[in-house]
Curated annotation (Swiss-Prot):
Annotated keywords: ATP-binding, Ligase, Nucleotide-binding, Protein biosynthesis
Protein name: Glutamyl-tRNA(Gln) amidotransferase subunit A
GO cellular component, one term: glutamyl-tRNA(Gln) amidotransferase complex
Pfam families reported for this sequence: Amidase
Cited SUPFAM superfamilies: Amidase signature (AS) enzymes
């Protein structure tokens, strides 16, 4: 799949039309998605209509933006007017939003072509996309394995060249972990940089929308298009959005990179450890100074997250009552209707997290669990603050393993939760984090390197990622998917 800039050049030079590019993406989806199952719905008519409008502009010699005519996948937890948004849940099987999310509106305004809504773990709760109420997405590198989650559909779609770029959301690693497992670039921006208006809420203090791409430059272009202040989102940061492509430089001279010591211990696959360490050594050859950094409370991120996120989910998911939207089960009383609808509509993992959250917020347990978890969250942020006094960017493995077999962890929730061990602390601290491909294991499965920046320092992440990418060939590898 060609890059955004190359496609843009072809459109401007009238070498190809937007309709041709879109048709090619739709044909690719048609050819491989029965195996990969990235998309919950393909919006072919909508896509071709958008592409025609872009071609009309070009025919009139009107200027078009970089994203005009570019095929993009949207995770199905972002509201799209008149197009079903299910959040991967049976409870929203028939929900057609009456309004547009801010990010999809920005992409519409830019002329981007949405080719479909991608699969996800139900309500974005999961690390394998096996919790979807509709289908299980496969990893394009090995169809018997998972793509990661919860944005597995978007990651797999980009890896399988079904679209050029895609949007996902990241609450505890849901962009970076699938990016790592699928061998693509995935970025979780600083909390508040991208509007959450129209994103179906899971854990409001952690959720953040971000890009998936085949290369760093495309991720920078897409972030630039969706970032920015939005008065409709009270957590949105009012800050100017730079042109992120200005940070794409081939050298790392003058940058100090910190390796988080605590991430190289127990539970890390030896092949992942070796591959990530080789990538870190490579950063030295690009001019970076590399030092070790200790974040002693990093390991408490996982237990703190599994109190905070379910607590917020318990509150957010209370709105699915079968009265206003979604499915409705017949019952004699209102309470029975709520109970029956939720029993049928919610999957097991969602029920599990609602129950955990309701418990940790209940009288007598609030101080012992929820309040304590919030204090731990502050301590983790302090560890990061101390680290960034010495270094520009922190690095560690994105995921402790490469892609695991479908069904391997479904009966053991704890081992599934451990998939996000190194990504969760970044969400708790509200920092930007990025996963870039840095090699393969013995089964030809991708390994990801995680880069972590200080608040609003996405530019430094792009600089490190781009310099690494341009001096290696991992991003050019494609899955053996016919």
């Amino acid at each position: 799949m060609t890059s955004i800039r190359e496609l843009h050049q072809q459109l401007v030079n009238k070498e190809r039309s937007a309709v041709e590019i879109t048709t090619e993406a739709l044909e690719r989806i048609n050819a491989v998605d029965s195996k990969v199952k990235s998309f919950l719905q393909v919006t072919a008519d909508h896509a071709l209509e958008t592409a025609k409008k872009v071609d009309e502009k070009i025919a009139k010699n009107e200027e078009i933006g970089l994203l005009a005519g570019i095929p993009i996948g949207i995770k199905d937890n972002m509201c799209t007017t008149g197009i079903k948004t299910t959040c991967g849940s049976k409870i929203l099987a028939n929900f057609v939003p009456p309004y547009e999310s801010t990010v999809t509106q920005k992409l519409k305004d830019a002329g981007a072509v949405m080719v479909g809504k991608t699969n996800l773990d139900e309500f974005a709760m999961g690390s394998s996309t096996e919790n979807s109420g509709y289908q299980v997405t496969a990893n394009p590198w090995d169809l018997s394995r998972v793509p990661g989650g919860s944005s597995g559909g978007s990651a797999a779609a980009v890896a399988a060249s079904e679209c050029v770029v895609a949007l996902g959301s990241d609450t505890g690693g849901s962009i970076r972990q699938p990016a790592s497992l699928c061998g693509v670039v995935g970025l979780k921006p600083t909390y508040g940089l991208v509007s959450r208006f129209g994103l179906v809420a899971y854990a409001s203090s952690l959720d953040q929308i971000g890009p998936f791409a085949r290369n760093v430059q495309d991720a920078a272009i897409l972030l630039g298009a969706i970032a920015g202040y939005d008065p409709k989102d009270s957590t949105s940061i009012n800050t100017p959005v730079p042109d992120y492509t200005q940070f794409l430089k081939p050298s790392l001279e003058g940058l100090t990179i910190g390796v988080i010591e605590e991430t190289f211990g127990e539970g890390l696959d030896p092949v992942v450890s070796k591959t990530v360490k080789a990538a870190i050594d490579h950063l030295k050859t690009l001019g970076a100074k590399v030092v070790n950094v200790s974040c002693p409370r990093f390991r408490y991120g996982l237990p703190a997250y599994y109190i905070i996120a379910p607590s917020e989910a318990s509150s957010n998911l209370a709105r699915y009552d079968a009265v206003k939207y979604g499915i409705r089960e017949d019952a004699d009383t209102l309470i029975d209707m709520y109970t029956k609808t939720r029993a049928v509509g919610f999957g097991n993992e969602v029920k599990r997290r609602i129950m955990i959250g309701t418990y940790t917020l209940s009288a007598g347990y609030y101080d012992a669990y929820y309040l304590k978890a919030q204090k731990v969250r502050t301590l983790i942020k302090q560890d990061f603050d101390a680290g960034f006094e010495k270094v520009d960017v922190l690095v560690c493995p994105t995921s402790p393993t490469t892609a695991f077999k479908a069904g391997e962890k479904t009966s053991d929730p704890l081992s599934m939760y451990l998939s996000d061990l190194t990504t969760i602390p970044v969400n708790l601290a509200g920092l930007p984090g990025m996963s870039i491909p840095c090699g393969f294991d013995d089964n030809n499965l991708p390994v990801g390197l995680q880069l972590i920046g200080n608040v609003l320092e996405e530019g430094k992440l792009f600089q490190v990622a781009y310099a690494y990418e341009q001096s290696t060939d991992w991003h050019n590898q494609v899955p053996p998917l016919q």
